[in-house]
Structures are given as structure tokens and as C-alpha cells.
Amino acid sequence: MEYQSPLSRLYHWEREAPDRVFLKQPIDGKWHTWTWKQVAREVRQLAGSLQALGLPKHSHIAMISKNCAHWIICDLAIIMAGHVSIPLHPNQQANCLQEVLQRSESALLFVGKLDNWNEMKAGVPGHIKCISFPFCNNDGCVSWSTFNDEHAPINENIERSATELCSIVYTSGTGGAPKGVMLTFEAFAFVTLNATQHLGLTHRDRFFSYLPLSHIAERMLVEMGSLYLGAQVAFAESLQTFSQNITTSKPTVFLGVHRIWTKFQQGILAKIPQKKLDVMLRVPIISQIVKTKIRKGLGLNGSTLVLTGASPTPQGLLSWFKRIGVTIQESYALTENCCYSNITLKEKIKIGYVGRPFPNCEVRLGPEDEIQVKHKGLMKGYYNEPEKTLEAFTKDGFFRTGDQGFIDEEGFLRITGRIKDLFKTSKGKYVAPSAIEMKFATHSIVEQVCVIGSGMCQPMALVTLSQTGKQMSKEDIRTTAAIMMQQMNDSLAAHEKLGKIIVLEEEWTVDNNLLPPSLKIKRNEIEKRYAVYYDNWELSETEIHFVNNYL
């Protein structure tokens, strides 16, 4: 396909559909809209103000905000001004913010919708100027209007070449310090043009943006997808208004992650208990009414493409949603391959597989069954880390994902684990913890899980409780957990069978450094946090332990 930059697509819609609504954002309960012409005007103005600063070309300019219209406007203005955008996760602590700003060598920081800017701002180095998005009152920042008032907009249609660096996207750091993934304009164009065509998306589609735009999946699907298609994006105002915002927006395309699907399931079961739901689904007429009502309640009644990604979604959860009329299509990709690897199409779904490769994408298995990917959208490398960049690629140019997989005779890929997560028990057998963790997803009392076992006789599962679990008595939890463990052990090999389930009172969050901003688990941090208890737990004859005197 012919190269088309994100800027060229903005100019196209500014010219061809100036009055069509591009962005919709609820502010204080009222919807605000921006047409393509209005977005382009704001982008041109901000780009002019950025150029007036006299920064060297290709300077690194960071953004930190929850999703909103001005996140996209700011991103486009940065690249129009000739610079490189550095999107930062909006839910990080001050020390993490400081680390990424220093690693990225950012010269400027835009600050938008945040819950804890007053705590976070301590991590901003003194030499970095901060500019606030509109509709935000961020202390210590120059206001949007003040920054823009004195400078002329850019009126010409500036272009950026395919090989230029567009953005540095920092990985969430589940296994150590975050790495800056360098992505070119060619990567953004190649992935978006191929993916949207393969998925059959058009300008009539509607996106709903709530997962962080700083994450590559949301950015490619929602920001780049809408930009290349000329489609509409609606935002969620807050967690409290999420349900109202999505039902009002009626998205045709929706991207979820494991945790969101679990929350949706818990919300449905809180209104319709599983036994009652089972009975209703067995009666055809009632079943159809129930399915329609559930989809409408979720805001997915108009959705034709429902995706899940970022981390594996358990088979049981996918099957549960399919049974109630929500067909979820699995996908698989990483930041380093610009969110372009494998996708499940609706007409050919295999539960437990993440589909076949996208067009113009090669996927193969290397040593240790490592999944390796090659296409024109791969990263240039990790910023200022040449050794890690060299390690990330094979000699023939494939990106080494670090994930393990299996490819069946039809070309479908199944993720089986992560090479670095494998541990060896005292019996000398290797265990893939993620495969065991996935089995917990069908049990409604569990919110989070991490399987440990390096050097132990048998693996253990550390779990936190869901709202359903927290409402149960200690003895009921003990009984349910014991049954749950027996059921799982029946399907596991002898060396994989769980010896203990440890019920933790402490939840794992970004604030206590046990979750990264992507909300996966920081396995190493969790293991270190509870390591002092391992010997006592292993020697105990009790199968179900409660920590911190839970309940």
C-alpha cells in the first residue's frame, strides 16, 4: 500500500469532511464535539506554538493524561511541529514519571486529565516546562490558552517522511525498567492501513476510548484507526460515568482486556445469578430477550467488532460471553511490533487461540517455541539501548517476543506462556504459571492471581478476592477455594498441581508497585513481597491460607 502519514489523513478529512464530527467528549456531564475542521484548527495552532519555542527538530515532547480529545490533538500537533511524541501512562507514581522523563530526554510535558497530579508533579525535573490541557486546572502548569495565544498557527500542510521517528512508546515494565520502543511513521501507516482493511472498518464506525491511549493497542486501534478511516471517537468521562457514556456512544468497535471482561461478568452476575441465567438461556424466546438486554446494558448492542488483547483472556471467560451473545475476538501483539501480529476473525473463531497472522506479517516459532514476528511495522529499536535492541532481533530480522506458543495445522496461534516466567520446582520440572493462572478466571471469587513455585515441591497460587469473594465468610471462602483447587488439579500434570492457595488481604495496585500501568501483574515484585512467608506456607499442612488476618 502507498505510504500515507497520519498528518496526510488529517489534511484529507479537513478538506473532504470538515463538518463531520470526529471527537466527542463528556465534560461535567455534557457532551462536547469537535469536527475535523475544528480539530485541524487546534492542531495547527498548537503546532505553531510549539515551533515558536525554537526547539531542535525531532525534540522529544511528552504527554500525560487520561483519554480525551486534546490527547489526540496534542499528539498530532507534536508531529506536525516536527517533533517526537512520548505518551506516558496516566496512573503512575512520581518516581516512575521522573524515570521515564529522564530516560526519554523529554524537553516539554503536556499535562491533562489526571487523578493525582499534585503527587505526580514531584517527579517532573525542574528544567521541563509543563503545559496544561484545556478543561484541566493543573497546578504549576502554563495554561493551554496562554501557551497558544501569542503565536501564529501552521497553515501549510507539513509532511513527515516514512523513515522519521514518530513516537517513543514506553513499555509498562512488568519485568524491570521500562524500555522506550521507537516507532516510525511507516510503522503507524503500514499497521493501520493493513489492519483496518483486514477488519473491514470504514468511516461509519464509532470507537469508544477508555483504555489508556498511552498503550499501543488503544492508540493504534482508536487514534490511528479513526484518523485513517475518518471515523468518530467518543470518550469516557470517568469510571463512574463509564456505563452511561458507552451506552450513549453506541460504539461499533470495542476493545477490552481481561480485567474489563471480568468486571462486566461480575456486574451481570450481580443482577442475574448464574443458576438463574442458565435457566433463562435454555428457553429460546427468553434467551434472545436476555442476550439483547445484556448487550444493551453493556453498551455493545451496536458493536460489530469486539476485541480483547493486551494479555490473554481465559477460554472459560470467552465461552461464557459467547453463550450470552457477545462474541469476543482475540488478538495478540506487542508494543515492539506496533500492535500487529495475530487476529481472530468472527467467521473463524477457535477458543483458546489468538488467530492467524495479519496480512503481510510473518509469524514463526523459534527455539524454545518462542513466537517471532516480522513485518514493515517493527520498531527501530529501544531508545538509547543498543544492546537490548540487538538481543530483541534474530539475524534474519524477526522480533523475538519472549512469548511461547503453538501453531496448529491451520495457522492458528495459541499462547502457552512466557519464557522468562517459567520456573523449576524442587522436582526439576518446569512450570508455566500463566497457564495455571488462566484457570482461575472462571471462578468468581478471585480477582487477581499469581502462581509461584521456584524451588518448591509444588506450585502455590497467591490470590486476591473479588467483590463476590469479599462478601463471603472465611469458612465459605476456604471451602470454595479447596473445591476450586481440586478441580484445577484434576486437569494439571503432577508437577503442576497446586499445593496451596494463599488468600491475600492486600490488593495489587499501581500505587503499591505490584501492577504496572497496563494492569498486568509485576510477577517479580509480587514474589519478592511475600518471599519471607514461603517456607512457612510450604511446610504447613493447611491448603488454604489467609494472610494479614483476612476476615
Enumerate the language-model features and the residues they cover.
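Gly/Ser/Thr-rich phosphate-binding loop
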Residues: 252-256, 264-349, 362, 447
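Conserved AMP-binding/adenylate-forming core of the ANL superfamily
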Residues: 22-68, 72, 76, 93-98, ...
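ANL superfamily adenylate-forming
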Residues: 115-162, 268-297
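Conserved pre-ATP/AMP-binding loop-to-beta segment of ANL
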Residues: 18-21, 151-170, 177, 200-206
